[in-house]
C-alpha cells in the first residue's frame, strides 16, 4: 500500500467557503454537514420543472427497457469488475452525469462469487449459456461464498432450510445492507481516502488473528478505491481529487455508487444520506452564481435516472421473494440534528420533485426521516406527494434516536436504520439475514417438531401437544422451546454466512467508503408475525381444538368463539405481540455473533409473505396449504400472510387502531425495523385535498412521536386501482419496505395486494358513527 501524495492547493480550492476544520483532518461527512448545512424552512415554490433534455433521456431509458422486456436483456458472460468493463452511456451527447452499471444500458452483470450455480441459473433463465472456462474456474479452482457456507452448515440449519422455517438466506448472493458513505468521494477525492487507509493500515501494531484480518481488509479497500479511480478515468473524470461544485459532487457520488453496482448484487444497494451533502455544494454554487436552480434540478434529475437504470441478474426463485425487481437504492432525507435544528434542505425537495419531473417510479427508494419538528411546509409537501404518487416511505427519527441512531443515520434496504459514521462504533453497517417463519415454528412445535405440512419430516425435538383443547400456557411453553431451537439455528446460519461472505466475496468497495473500524448490526427477521400473535390470542381467549389424523398429527384447527386480533388496539392481544418480539430478540441477543455484531430484529417481509404463505399449513386463524394424495402441495385454500408488521386482513381495526397497536411494539427489540404498509382511501382523510393532506400530517406526527418507526403510505381507493393492477398496467405502490410497479408482480402477488385492507375509515369508531348516521 503506497503513500498517496495530493496537492494541498486542490483541497483549498475545493473547500473554499466551507466552514469548520475537524472534518478536514479526518474523513467525516457527518462533521462536515454539521458545520455547513442550511436548514430550509420554506415551501416548494422554488422548484424547477423538467427540461427537454431530461425528458429525452427519460424516453431513451423507458423505451430501451420496454424493448428488452419484450425480447431479452443483454447480459455479460464475463466475470464482472469495476473498471475492466468499458464505460457505458445512455445517450453520451445528451447526458450530464456519467456512469452506468455496464458498457451498455441495462446490460446485466455476471457475478459468480456468491455462488456459481445461482449465477449460471440467472444466465440460463435470461437466455444465455455460461462460459465453460468460467464454469471450470468456479467449480474446480475458486471457492464461492455458497461453497464455503455449505461446507460449514449444520444439520439443524439444513433441516430448517428444507422445511422453509428459515428462508431467503443470503447464502448464494451478496448480502447487501451495507451503505458506503459515497459522498466521501465527492468531498475528499480518492487520493485522500486512500492515504487515510494507508495510515490506518500502518497504525496496526499488534499482530493477532483479528488484526491480520483487518489489515487484509484495509488493503482490499485501498485496492477498491484504486479501481474507483480507474472507473472515473474511463469517463474522463479525475475522482482522485475532490469535487469542485455540485455537478461534480453528484458525478463523483454516481461513480462511487456505480462502482458498487458493477460488482455487488446484494439484496439491497442503498445510497444513504446524500441529499443533505449535495445541498451544501448547491447552496455554495447558487451564491456564487455557478449554476441556476434549473440547472441544479436537471443534474438531480439526470442522477436519479441513472439510479433507475440499475438492474441485477436475478433468478426466478429470487424474484418470488423480492418481486418487481427492486434494487433498494434507498435515499434518506430530512430528519433532526442533535442540536435541535431540523435537517430539511432544498435538496430534499429536489429529490422528491423528480417524481413530478421525470415521472413516478419505484427507484430510488425515497425515504423521509420524519419528525413533528420538521417545517410544516415540508411535511405538507411530502403528504401531497404521497397523495399523488404513493411512492415515499417515512421513518420516525424520534423512535430511532433512542436506540443510538444519530443525526446522519440513513435507511438501508427497506426500513432498517444505520449510522455509517457513528463514532461510537455502533450501527455502522448491517449483516443481512432475511427472516424466519415463526408461525411454522409454532405449528411444528405443536406436532412434536414434525413439519406442519409434511408430517413425516422431523425438524426439531420437542414434546407434542396432545390436549383436545389447546391450553395457552401449555402452548406457550412448547412455543418457547421451539423459539429456543429456531433462534439457536438462525444464529448459527448467520454467523456462518457472514464469515464466509467476508472470506470469499468481501464488499471492499463499499467498505472503502466507511470508517476503517466499524461495528455491525446483525439483522434477523420475522415473518408470519400477525398470524402467530392472533393464533396465540385465539388459544387464550377462544376455544381452539386441534384436528388430528389417525396418527395423531395435527393438520387443522377448529376455533370457536371470539378473540381479539392484533391491530385492533386491544391490550389483551397487543401484549402478546410485545411478548413475542421481546422473546425472539432476547434469545438472539444472548448469543456471540460474528465480529461482535449487535442482534437486531425486523418485522418485514417484502413480497415474500406470499411465498411463506405457500409453505405453511393451517393455523387456528387462517387456512394454509396441505398435501394432495400424491404428495403435491395444494394451494387452493391458502390465505396469504399480511406483510411485515401489518395486522391480519381479518383484524377489524381501522387505520388508527392499526397504528396504535404498532406503536406498542418496542423498537428496542426491533432495531432492524417495524414495517407497516398502509392503504388509505382519500375519502377517509377528509372531503378536500387540502383537508386530506393536513390530516395525513397530523396522523404521521402522532404516530412517530408516539413510538412508531415506519410507514409505507399509499393513498388510493381499491376500486380505482384494482382492474389496473390485475390487468398488468403501470401502478406504483409501496409494499413491505419498498416501492414496486405492480405490473411486475405475479398473479398471486397481485391477488394478495388487492386483498389487503384498504382503509375507508380512519377508526372503527368513525365506522360506528357513520353507521348510526346512515352515511
Curated annotation (Swiss-Prot):
Keyword Acyltransferase included in the entry's annotation: yes
Keywords, alphabetical: Acyltransferase, Carbohydrate metabolism, Cytoplasm, Glucose metabolism, Organic radical, Transferase
Domain PFL span(s) in chain numbering: 9-626
GO biological process terms on file: glucose metabolic process
Membrane-crossing residue ranges in chain numbering: none
Gene Ontology terms for molecular function: formate C-acetyltransferase activity
Pathway: Fermentation; pyruvate fermentation; formate from pyruvate: step 1/1
Pfam families: Gly_radical, PFL-like
Protein name, UniProt field: Formate acetyltransferase
Subunit field text: Homodimer.
Family per similarity comment: Belongs to the glycyl radical enzyme (GRE) family. PFL subfamily.
Protein location: Cytoplasm
Stored PANTHER family: FORMATE ACETYLTRANSFERASE
This enzyme's EC code(s): 2.3.1.54
Glycine radical PTM positions: 737
Active-site positions on this chain: 413 (s-acetylcysteine intermediate), 414 (cysteine radical intermediate)
Keyword Acyltransferase found: yes
Parts forming coiled coils: none
Misc note: Several mechanisms have been proposed based on complexes formed with substrate analogs. After activation by the glycine radical, the cysteine radical, Cys-414, can abstract hydrogen atoms from the other active site cysteine, Cys-413, and from coenzyme A, and it can also transfer hydrogen atoms to product radicals. The other active site cysteine can attack the central carbonyl of pyruvate and covalently bind the product acetyl group.
GO CC list: cytosol
Catalysis: reaction(s): formate + acetyl-CoA = pyruvate + CoA
Gene3D superfamilies: 3.20.70.20
Domain Glycine radical: 642-762
Superkingdom to which the source organism belongs: Bacteria
